Amino acid sequence: MTTEPISAAEIARARAEHPLAFRAPLPVRLRRAALWTGFSLLIAWCLYDFGFSPIRIWEGLGRLGRVLSFMFPPHVWTEWREFSEILKGLGETLSMAFLGTLLGAVFAFPLSFLGAKTINRLPVLRFGVRRGFDVIRSFETLILALIFIRAFGLGPLAGVLAIAVGEIGVLAKLYAEAIENASNKPVDGVVASGGSRLQSIRFAVLPQVLPVLLSVTLYNFESNVRSGTILGIVGAGGIGFLLADRIGAYRWDEAWSIIFLIIAMVYLIDWLSGLIRARFIGTWEGAR
């Protein structure tokens, strides 16, 4: 099958009959130009206000290269006392992330039903609950840790509470969205069979959303392991405290060895959580 080329006259006739198909109207073009100009001016102002310059970037890269050169050779702990301190810090960070995620999930699970429009039919109550989720999420975990450190003192307890409170807002919102996206057909089947509203939630909604809730919780746990490292730097204990101590003392070889251990721990947790998702969700995709 062959097609003949379109002549210039046909193109000109089509342009005359349908001008908007070839070029946007003038108001649209002006609006686009204004948006792109404002966007470019905003970027330029940010770069100027932040002191961006090629010379500064080049000098910073040089200093960064010197810091990275301290990675080799990495430090190897020869005394069990020093290495046990590092392992204890890793264990504290892992415990903070686990307990904080667990406590957050325990409180977020029932609250998510109050925030789901398919379950809570009271708009005023649902609106208040959802805005409460927003208020909790507006506080960064690091800020919560500083507040709890002032209240409960230094140590992992402040980190656990900071992660737990932050997770309530995040997990409750994600749980509520998963519940809202559940299909209503199983619910209608349970109700048609004479089941109550609670039974429809138990036997129709939960089987659909539990795999999603598990996947979200595991992902947040992985993220909280990394957050636990940062919380340790501000005094919440864990491996972050030891890392900040080594960096402050310019013991870069030990600092980089600790960073390597953190990377290995995060990788191991990701692998294990992938196996758990594969076991309960029925797919090995997350474990690849």
Identify the role of each PLM range.
Residues 150, 227-262, 281-288:
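Glycine-rich helix-loop "coupling/hinge" segments at transmembrane-helix boundaries
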Residues 107-111, 158-161, 165-179, 183-187, ...:
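Membrane-embedded alpha-helices of multi-pass transport/permease systems
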Residues 182-199, 203-209, 236:
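Short helix-to-coil transition segments within interhelical loops
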Residues 133-164:
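Generic hydrophobic transmembrane alpha-helix motif, especially the helices
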Residues 111-145, 174-177:
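Cytoplasmic-entry segments and transmembrane alpha-helices of multi-pass inner-membrane transporters
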